[in-house]
Structure formats: structure tokens, C-alpha cells
């Protein structure tokens, strides 16, 4: 409904409006340096996704779905229904601070209430199912209080943009139903399931139209087929999902119940992050119009600078403020005048004094207690999905290495103790090389430049 209204306000057909904005997000993935072989950009209208959503619907048992009259309080910005007690005074959405709408119509409902016991058992046997633990406790409490069935369709006459419900062209799938399915549709689930043919579902006028079907589908950023789903969902032990704290119930309860109903294994882990907030601590949101265009930041500061800020300066689990001023301060302090200055000073000492990098010495880093400690801490950060912790560990090495330059002053020592100074510079080159390798997942371009500089030092 949000897309339909936004397109109408822009004076465009919904399909044209959505395609134009989708391309902007597709470009963002490229600009942020996401590995094309590891991501698949997917949209509601993609055949791969439509087949997956319709197939999942068709796999539910008759007792999992029923059709009934419904009246609810709906926020267009959140694309979600709210209980009265969850709203602010005046029936305002707690996120957008705008009035919710009363929706009255006949919808299909998913029997969410039937999965309370199974969900609680899932949380009990999987203590790391939701990270951080405070969010696991939150969803456990929510489910423990009892569940209400939720609407999974809208009338196509009122919401003419969505995936047609199998065998009922008068309804399209509710956005939160089909959106959750992308976790399996994007990795080729519909191709991995026999009979995933949705040709019997005819789209009503204005609804998403199916493209031609195939068994191997991609958008130019990674082709997926039946083996892709088996690899990522089954052979790796499950999929890790990331979402904002306002999606906790959808991801950790509703989606898991849908998987159970279809006979699929649950997700492996769900990481819940906080909001990125703007002025006044308000959540950044397209609907609120208080976002900052990351492409503009990339254009001025480069991809790695943006990746650095997101990983190290934003909390992985709590709300984090973002302003241009904070970004500039972090860039100058930790990248330009921090890492950048350190690399420049070490390479100048190495090239100016003919000291080259000795790769065989990298294996001796165990004698540097701070590097081993930071390396272990970095690994723990990645294992616990705490990227900020991993980045802080790397910057501890950077700070220690900078302190060594200040304390030993090899650029001065070289005049009175050439051998000692050269040994210091060799150690600094090793440290710089290790810093480069550890930065690869966070700042790949910068890391590769550092590694190249060190390896080619003479």
C-alpha cells in the first residue's frame, strides 16, 4: 500500500515507480563493495520470489489458514497492524508518530496461535537463536503470553500491488507474508521443491505479473538454483538473519511458525540490531524523510569509510546516532589522521631506509602478545556477530603500533643504531601487514592497498 500511494503521489505507475527506486538500491550494493558472488538482489515481482511465496502458501495445510472478516489498526509506513495498547495517545504509530488507519475487509489468516508451544520449545533448545539475549527474552515473553492469528492477505481491489494468492485472484499476499519468504526464495527454494509451479494463479489487474519461469534464476548478482538452497539452508546448518528491533516478532516468531507449517527447518540465528537515529534520536526512515544518502558519502569519502563507520561507530545491537558531523569526526580521527597517517609514516621509514618486508617473519607474530590477543578478540567478535568488537580489536593493534613508532622513534634511531632501527621497521611492516589482512572483511579496498604497499616495500 505504501508503494501504491507513493507512486500515485509521484504521478507514476506503481511498476515504474518501484522499478526506479529498486535500481537505486541495486546500485548501493555495488557502491558499498558487496561481493557479487555472495548476494542476490531480489524484488517482490521477481519470478524466483513469486514462485517461492506462492509455493510456501500452497504447502500449508487447510487447518493452517482460514478466511474471515477482519478489522485492524494499520500503519502504512510500517506496513504492519498494531494492537491498541501498542499505539501512542491519539492512535499514533510509535515509530512514525502518524495516525494509523482502520482496515475492514475479509482476509486470509495464518493460524499463528497454534504454534505457541513449538516456538517456545525452539527458544528453549536454541539459546543463541536470537542475539542479543535480551531480545530472545523479549520474544519468549511475547510468545508466552499467547498468540493471535495474523492476516496474510489483502483484497487486490484495495491493494493492487502484490503477489496473487494461489487459487484466489481476488487477494494478494500481505507484504509481511511474502517479504519473509525472501530468506528462502532468494536462495532458490522454489527450484529445490518439486512442483513449484504457480501457473494456476492468475494475477488480477494491477498486481505483480509473473515473468517466464526457469530452474536457474539470477539478476546479474549471483545465479541461484536448487543446489543453492540445499547449500545455504541445509548443509551449512541454517541461515543467519539480520533485522531491526521493530521486526523481532515478524522474524523470530511469525516467520518461524510459517516455516514450521511448511515442514521446513527454522532459521539458525536471528541478529537484532538497533535503529540508526537522526536528529532528536528519531529512527532514520524513508517514510519520515530523515535519511542520509549513503551514495553521497561514498562519493565524497569512499566506500571503505562508510563501511568503517557502520561497523565500528554504530552499535551492533542498540540504537546509534548518525550525523554528518559525527561521520566527519570519525573519518578524520581514525582514518585520515589515524590509520592513514600510520601507514604513511611506516612506509616512508621503510622505503627511505631500504628496509623490505620479510614475509617469513609473519609466522613469528606469536611473540607479539598484543597482536595475538587482538587477533583472538577479533575472531570472537565475528563469531558473536559483534562487528564493532572485531573492529575495536583491530584498532587496538593500530593504536599499539602507533605507540611503538612514538616510543622507539626508528626515524631518529637510524642515525645512531642502524641495525636496531631496521629491526624496529621490520616489526612495524609486519604489524602493518597483519593490520591489512585483518581489515579485509571491513575495509577491503584499503586493506588490499596496505598489503600491496607492504609486500612491495624495498
Indicate residue ranges for each PLM-predicted region.
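N-terminal, positively charged nucleic-acid-binding surface of large information/translation enzymes
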Residues: 1-128
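Hydrophobic residues in alpha-helical segments
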Residues: 7-9, 123, 142-143, 260, ...
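Surface-exposed helix-capping loop/turn segments at secondary-structure junctions
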Residues: 32-38, 63-66, 261-266, 348-358, ...
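Beta-strand segments within the central parallel beta-sheet cores of soluble alpha/beta enzyme folds
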Residues: 40, 269-272, 451-452
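Structured secondary-structure scaffolds
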Residues: 48-59, 95-96, 102-194, 222-352, ...
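Short, glycine- and charge-enriched coil/turn segments that flank and shape catalytic ligand pockets
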Residues: 90-91, 125-126, 168, 193, ...
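Intrinsic disorder/low-complexity segments
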Residues: 192-224, 362-364, 369
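Helix-rich, typically C-terminal accessory recognition domains appended to large enzymatic cores
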Residues: 313, 318, 326-363, 367-458
Amino acid at each position: 500500500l505504501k508503494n501504491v500511494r507513493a507512486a500515485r503521489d509521484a504521478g507514476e505507475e506503481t511498476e515504474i515507480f518501484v522499478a526506479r527506486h529498486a535500481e537505486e538500491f541495486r546500485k548501493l550494493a555495488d557502491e558499498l563493495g558487496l561481493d557479487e558472488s555472495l548476494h542476490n538482489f531480489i524484488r517482490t515481482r521477481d519470478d524466483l520470489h513469486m514462485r517461492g511465496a506462492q509455493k510456501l502458501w500452497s504447502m500449508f495445510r487447510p487447518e493452517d489458514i482460514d478466511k474471515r472478516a477482519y478489522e485492524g489498526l494499520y500503519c502504512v509506513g510500517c506496513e504492519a497492524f498494531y494492537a491498541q495498547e501498542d499505539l501512542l495517545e491519539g492512535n499514533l504509530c510509535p515509530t512514525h508518530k502518524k495516525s494509523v488507519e482502520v482496515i475492514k475487509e475479509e482476509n486470509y489468516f495464518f493460524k499463528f496461535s497454534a504454534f505457541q508451544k513449538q516456538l517456545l520449545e525452539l527458544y528453549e533448545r536454541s539459546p543463541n537463536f536470537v542475539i542479543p539475549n535480551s531480545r530472545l527474552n523479549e520474544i519468549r515473553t511475547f510468545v508466552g503470553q499467547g498468540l493471535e492469528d495474523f492476516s496474510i492477505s489483502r483484497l487486490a481491489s484495495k491493494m493492487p500491488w502484490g503477489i496473487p494468492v494461489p487459487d484466489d485472484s481476488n487477494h494478494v499476499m500481505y507484504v509481511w507474508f511474502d517479504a519473509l519468504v525472501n530468506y528462502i526464495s532468494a536462495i532458490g527454494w522454489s527450484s529445490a521443491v518439486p512442483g513449484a509451479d504457480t501457473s494456476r494463479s492468475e494475477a488480477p489487474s494491477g498486481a505483480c505479473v509473473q515473468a517466464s519461469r526457469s530452474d536457474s534464476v539470477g539478476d546479474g548478482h549471483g545465479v541461484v538454483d536448487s543446489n543453492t538452497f540445499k547449500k545455504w539452508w541445509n548443509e551449512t546448518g541454517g541461515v543467519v538473519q539480520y533485522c531491526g528491533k521493530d521486526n523481532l516478532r515478524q522474524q523470530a516468531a511469525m516467520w518461524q511458525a510459517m516455516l514450521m507449517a511448511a515442514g521446513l527447518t527454522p532459521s539458525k540465528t536471528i541478529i537484532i540490531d538497533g535503529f540508526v537515529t537522526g536528529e532528536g534520536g528519531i529512527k532514520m526512515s524513508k517514510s519520515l524523510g530523515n535519511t542520509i544518502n549513503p551514495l553521497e558519502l561514498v562519493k565524497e569519502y569512499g566506500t571503505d569509510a562508510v563501511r568503517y563507520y557502520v561497523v565500528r561507530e554504530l552499535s551492533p545491537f542498540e540504537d546509534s546516532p548518525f550525523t554528518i558531523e559525527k561521520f566527519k569526526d570519525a573519518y578524520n580521527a581514525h582514518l585520515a589522521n589515524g590509520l592513514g597517517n600510520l601507514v604513511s609514516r611506516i612506509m616512508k621509514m621503510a622505503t627511505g631506509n631500504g628496509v623490505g618486508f620479510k614475509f617469513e617473519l609473519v609466522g613469528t607474530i606469536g611473540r607479539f602478545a598484543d597482536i595475538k590477543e587482538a587477533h583472538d578478540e577479533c575472531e570472537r567478535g565475528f563469531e558473536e556477530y559483534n562487528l564493532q568488537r572485531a573492529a575495536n580489536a583491530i584498532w587496538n593493534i593500530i593504536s599499539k603500533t602507533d605507540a611503538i613508532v612514538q616510543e622507539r622513534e626508528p626515524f631518529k634511531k637510524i642515525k645512531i643504531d642502524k641495525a636496531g632501527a631496521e629491526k624496529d621497521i621490520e616489526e612495524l611492516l609486519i604489524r602493518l601487514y597483519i593490520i591489512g589482512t585483518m581489515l579485509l572483511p571491513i575495509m577491503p579496498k584499503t586493506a588490499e592497498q596496505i598489503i600491496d604497499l607492504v609486500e612491495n616495500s624495498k
